[in-house]
């Protein structure tokens, strides 16, 4: 689902060789997930009989700050920490939390994982992530270079290694 809460919202569903994009108004994330369940369990795009067949759900979270250096299972504490990090991604993290909370309502106890876009870049050394500004801005506000779109960079890097038939550890790539 895209553009949840806007009149231009839509759902794209692909399964069994059938792909469809349908305009639909989703005022809330919960309503959007309910439509996702409907698409997955009925019609030409049916791919499961019931949500109990889903093993896990992944959520892309834009900013994990310095708290999250890898993906993790979502707990109430993880959601609260993502909420605390919202000033670092005020347009994305709050919307991501809405999606996580709605998914919890719709999908119940299915395990959910947060995949942080900033995690890929978490191994940068301080000389690469510190800005030439007063150090107290980093200490008080967490102002530093984080790196974004890490999930995409990781995917492209691993695909390049696969294509080149080289271990990723031996490659120096620009993605």
What kind of feature is each model-predicted range?
Residues 1-65:
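N-terminal glycine/serine-rich phosphate-binding loop of ATP-dependent small-molecule kinases
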Residues 8-11, 81, 89, 140:
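A broad, structure-centric signal for solvent-exposed, well-ordered loop/edge residues
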Residues 18-21, 76-79, 131-135:
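Short, low-complexity, polar/charged sequence segments that are solvent-exposed and flexible
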Residues 20-22, 82-86, 139-143:
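Short glycine/proline- and acidic residue-enriched helix-loop micro-motifs
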Residues 26-30, 34, 72, 76, ...:
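Electropositive phosphate-/nucleotide-binding environments in soluble metabolic enzymes
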Residues 46-92, 120-130:
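Short beta-strand-loop/turn "lid" adjacent to the catalytic site in phosphate-handling enzymes
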Residues 93-175:
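Phosphate-binding/catalytic loop of phosphoryl-transfer enzymes
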């Amino acid at each position: 689902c895209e553009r949840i809460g806007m009149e231009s919202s839509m759902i794209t569903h692909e399964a069994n060789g059938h792909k469809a994009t349908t305009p639909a108004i989703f005022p809330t994330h919960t309503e959007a997930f309910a439509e996702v369940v409907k698409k997955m369990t009925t019609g030409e795009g049916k791919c499961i009989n019931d949500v109990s067949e889903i093993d896990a759900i992944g959520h892309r979270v834009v900013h994990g700050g310095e708290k999250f250096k890898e993906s993790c299972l979502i707990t109430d504490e993880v959601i609260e920490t993502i909420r605390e990090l919202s000033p670092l991604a005020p347009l994305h993290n709050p919307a991501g939390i809405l999606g996580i909370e709605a998914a919890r309502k719709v999908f119940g106890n299915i395990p959910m994982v947060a995949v942080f876009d900033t995690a890929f870049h978490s191994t940068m050394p301080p000389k690469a992530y510190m800005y030439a500004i007063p150090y107290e801005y980093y200490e008080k506000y967490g102002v530093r270079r984080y790196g974004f779109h890490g999930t995409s960079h990781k995917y492209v890097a691993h695909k390049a290694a696969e294509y080149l038939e080289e271990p990723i550890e031996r490659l120096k790539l620009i993605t």
